[in-house]
């Protein structure tokens, strides 16, 4: 079965709906299958943003031109693998140019609403976080739901000479210090999501991070993001999360249509019955639509 066949399978249960409503719902479901997530990544220079992206995503990279002068400090890259893609937005680091921090705050406020998720990357051994804290409470609070903190370069945490290069794992003492750092970041920022700890260059901690990241994404974004992950990171639990997210997003299409249109009660009953059948089918054909 191919992607078109998967979508055709979703059409069959819709046949009992009036044509206009059926077309509306089908179009919105098709939009879900073509959705392009937008993920922001921020952090000071040297935090390892590029290495983290390379560790997570496999898609072919191409720059996205932006003619808007107000976003001249923002770099956009499209990652494409197969029929799906996502956009990475590289946001300017805070606290590195005091004269422009106010400008950056305004920039973030403009851009954050369009992002599905922001990965805020912090070096595991970075102790100068007061500016980050000020920026978080000064500009990012309304968007907490979209922010996932990532402690990167776990291999640099002291005692760094104890990092096991053979197994790419931290020593017991490093693990203890990483837990302390994780707790310190949690206490400082009070994030809504768990703080992730990784070494992107060593490939340590990224599976756990991906699991957390998938839980933080809106339902519409989980499946297309899963298509861009390196194969070893697109585990069955991750695929299951994405499959369920797609089902939830499809269900929401029906819920929105039912609540926003003036429909007679008998038709609403039919919509709910069709909804359950289509959501079940969406989960069943998920692999053919996205992989």
Q: Could you say what each language-model-derived stretch is?
A:
Residues 198-201, 209-217, 230-291:
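P-loop NTP-binding site
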Residues 1-91, 95, 281, 288:
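Conserved G1/Walker A P-loop phosphate-binding module
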Residues 155-227:
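Canonical P-loop GTPase G-domain recognition
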Residues 71-74, 91-139:
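Switch II of P-loop NTPase G domains
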Residues 84, 113-118, 143-147, 190-194:
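Short glycine-/polar-rich loops that comprise or flank the Walker A/P-loop
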Residues 1-20, 172-176, 180, 237, ...:
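Alpha-helix boundary/N-cap detector
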